[in-house]
Amino acid sequence: MNLYRNNAIMAGVLLIIATVTNMLGNLSIKPILDATDYLIQISANENLMIIALLLVLISAFASAGIAICLYPILKKYHEALALGSVGFRVMESMLYIIGVVALLLLLTLSQEYVNAGASNASLFQISGTLLLAVKTWAGMLGVIAFTTGAMMYYIVFYQSKLVPRWLTGWGFLGAALSLASAVLVIAGLLSSLSTVFIVFNLLILVQEMVLAVWLIVKGFNPSVIASKSPQGE
């Protein structure tokens, strides 16, 4: 029983940490990256960039930690899906780290650009564009990995009734919409800055906060823990 309770609390806390740090990190530097003179602005806001990227790194590790905390519980009900969720969320973490590395390289490029003045400006601009593209594509692929992993553990939650089905159904739908939005962005049919993209991702954002509070306050269904035999074994 302690394993279920402790892991539920840890997963809930990590859900909050992953979401909050990701939002704070990305939103704080968005105006800088969107500026027309971003190569100058990045260098001028070096401290903010470093703090924001540290927050994104925390988010990346917390994201992987969520599935790792859930794995000992979910494997009792469906080991393949539990393992798959860990794999995809670790992949998500790695992709976000790639995005962070791209922005750290962009910070170095920005500093060199400012020091060089007008010399080789076009080369700096091309390099900056490529690094921003790496960050963008890594982020979208990270969303795909996240939503795939999330849908796997929501399926196990739904089948096992460890958490209420209305909450897991909400999570699965939200993850599916978020996955669709990322695929549409990669296909060039949707902008990551569009209202549609934001709406498609809002559902899973709210649901994960509700799930986090549920896991921390109530944990997993005690009647399922006490009496229900593992499924999928």
Identify what each model region corresponds to.
Residues 1-233:
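Hydrophobic, aromatic-enriched alpha-helical segments typical of multi-pass transmembrane helices
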